[in-house]
Amino acid sequence: MKIQIFLNLLYQNLNHQYIFDFHDLMSEFLYELDRKEIYEHSINQEQFNEEDFLNQRAYVLTNGNKYYHDIISLIKPLDGELKCPQLLTLPAKAWSIKNNKSIEKYPHTPKYNIQAKSNTKYW
């Protein structure tokens, strides 16, 4: 529900550059959370799965600044059962709805690579 509300706000009220800037900022936060120490400090993890780790990091972003800082500072463990894959496609969906075009035609590549282990400084 939270994602749908944000999607509506994003595509109804914002221009293309704002959507692209949001995507870049989201990618930066996901990139910063891409750390071996965060994964190793997590709970409810069976074995490393790149897609799950990405979706878990996305969940962190949906829960606000304090939660993000608690995770990145290792105050709280990342919970392997909590995921939010919908966030990852939010900018492309907003652009698609706003422009009445296919999501595959989304023209923006985010500033940071969000895939697991792309932040080589911390792996």
What are these regions (language model features)?
Residues 68-70, 74-123:
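Basic, alpha-helical nucleic-acid-binding regions used in initiation and control of genome expression
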